[in-house]
């Protein structure tokens, strides 16, 4: 993408996370599929090409989800919506549940893609020589409204809930 991040506002009319236009090696190109699926698919393609040439690789994969506009894949939204119908989430209210089904639907897709990436590394004998690091860039956007591990604050705020992030390393 032609900047340090993929903006929340579409660069092209009609870019809605599905079948969008991205820049690859300086050329605009339309890709088929959901944005996060496309990014992971292209990353795996790059890793396999590098491996087949016996070249070491560094792949920094930064997704644009979960950021607004919150448009998850329908299967992910429906799954989260069903989970949120459980009694233990009744206190959240319907509007928050609707918003969470979008936000957490995007996170579910990232989780699914991380799992596929780990299987890809295993299946292609790349795991033993690859360090996989997963971390996020900031705390939760929703903050303590639904879950923030008991921390005060949320994204853009100075408290722990805004800047403490998960970090997982697999080697």
Segments (PLM) and residue ranges:
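Active-site-proximal cap/lid insertion segments
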Residues: 1-171
